[in-house]
């Protein structure tokens, strides 16, 4: 009988330890860059890949003709969430068309982030088949229940070959991160580390937060090195916005018009291959870069030789006239000072893109169809190329963006996707 208290104590300790030992792990997905479109995809289920769209509010895929719609009534909370954000091309497909009258179930309006096309589609139940992770390796397979919208195959136009839909990663309740968080009981945040260039090895996305380790320095957790800035809410837009206080080239502030950066803000957008700048920001930025590069040559650096521009870029150079280093071409650095006062610095690897043999261009593009100072458009749209080899943490609960540039000896493609025993 004397042993009974010890047995009770042992059971009590086991019960107290249970939550820690059964803590739900984040969900892992490899991120592949498509060489033809420069878009990024993740596997979704059973060989089907979907494009990751950091500004997309929904998950959508093509469906079999005989698919069964989910029984979401037209006035249900899920139906309202699925139709909370409409793309401009869907503006006429509003409340009067939310119902499939033949089945009296909810319809949503999936949107192609490249062409801008949209179409009506049933909401369905699906599964995101992936692996949990400890931040070092995959741990075990998991099937995450999710709600998605069906889309006709014509909506796949201009997406990567083999893609069957889009996974929206925006700050909406039916975007993939929020659905994973709800089903897996993990934080509503995700890590994104896009692979550099056209590497065959994938980058990594982790839904639910860190840690995050890479093989080059396996003891180093890059989520501990993040600088943070607030995420800014935009009415009627679930995309991830931040504010930018200033832009500098070679540590000299670019003389953009007063309030230009504050008007419209900045948005992170994987659907754009390169960073877009509104004209009132683009012109002074490009001029500042060109002058800084000339000054660099006059001060003893390599003299860059301009060549005929290659669309959509304006400043292009002969690569033989640019010194190549471990951090890319030796060109003036570009620094974004974000709302928190932290600096997001871009070296030659992030500012210059080789467009053909012997030619590299400044990888920033003027935004089209938008007037200078138009607050309905962002001043800066940070594209996928400039996000590559950078650990990004989108934290929807704390409403902040974390960012950390990887050192030259580490790549987003160096996550160890070998499952642990």
What function would you assign to each model-found segment?
Residues 3-22:
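Cleavable N-terminal signal peptides of Sec/SRP-targeted secreted and luminal proteins
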Residues 22-38:
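Short N-terminal segments immediately surrounding and downstream of signal-peptide cleavage
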Residues 113-222, 227, 336, 341-407:
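Glycine-rich flap/beta-hairpin and adjacent strands of clan AA aspartyl proteases
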Residues 35-146, 150-159, 302:
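Signature of the N-terminal lobe/flap region of pepsin-like aspartyl proteases
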Residues 66-90, 181-184, 188, 218-226, ...:
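Cytochrome P450 catalytic domain signature, combining two hallmark sequence patches
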Residues 202, 206-264, 361:
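Flexible, small-/acidic-enriched active-site or ligand-binding loops
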Residues 6, 34, 46, 52-57, ...:
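Aspartic protease catalytic domain
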